[in-house]
Amino acid sequence: MNRIVEVNRLTKEYGRDAAVKDVTFAVEEGKIYGLLGRNGAGKTTIMHMLTAQLFPSSGELKVFGENPYENNRVLSQLCFIKESQRYPDSYRVLDVLKVAASIYPNWDRDLAAQLLEDFRLPLKRRMKKLSRGMLSSVGIIIGLASRAPLTIFDEPYLGLDAVARSLFYERLMQDYAENPRTIMLSTHLIDEVSNMLEHVLVIDQGRLLIDEEAEDLRGKAYTVLGPRAAVESFTAGKNTIHQESIGGMMSVTLLERLDPGDKRRAEAQGLEMIPISMQQLIVHLTQSKSNGKVAEFQ
């Protein structure tokens, strides 16, 4: 597939501290990406560099095959909805959407109107009088209606209840199916979006831990549970990312694809093999990294 973002050894330093360290990855056209990790991991810094809002200290970055900085041809194809998107206080919702329509060449007026109705936004209310959830809804409408070939959402649903978040996911997937584009989601509500993700990038302490297709990742992340001796024997030499024990029982979380022989052996030893959620996987990965136990990711 066509690569629309290419990042090579990207680094961003603030004095002696590096927010992003030697990160390399590519983003392909027509996929939904999850940019995942703990708060302060470097995700937002990466998104700001991808959208030409922050210069890297070193490394190379291309978006749609070009340097994105001061490049209107590239920037007109990007839509970045920030975690706490700010708007002029004097603007009404209607004014903000008019500006967005003038910025994005692919703006879908009908979709914007439908989303306004879905999220029950008052068109003539001034931005400074909107609740936190309403402000998030405005950002969601801009992101979806922009139809930008690369659309990036950074925690886009602050203040939204579960019903409104579910509506966002539903509308996103519906529009993505009808009008494919590349979408990048950065979120801490990983379990809510995990089934939507096609590719996963995991950032921790400024470094890239995982760059993998979501389906492949799901297929090799699981917990082995059973008597301590049997679990220790079965998991010896395997890629362990988390373990805990209670009494004579032990659970070990692995990130490694098993062959049919492994699965038969586990069953013969009376061990349970439990798939883990994407959120559990990210928690275990970043905990093991912060504890100095860096797993290898095959």
Mark where each language-model region is.
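Conserved ABC transporter NBD signature motif
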Residues: 59-74
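ABC transporter nucleotide-binding domain
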Residues: 169-256
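Catalytic Walker B motif of ABC-type/P-loop ATPase nucleotide-binding domains
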Residues: 151-155, 160
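Walker A (P-loop) phosphate-binding loop of ABC-type ATPase nucleotide-binding domains
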Residues: 37-42
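C-terminal coupling/interaction segments
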Residues: 248-298
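ABC-family P-loop ATPase nucleotide-binding domains
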Residues: 80-138
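Helix-to-loop junction immediately C-terminal to a conserved catalytic motif
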Residues: 51
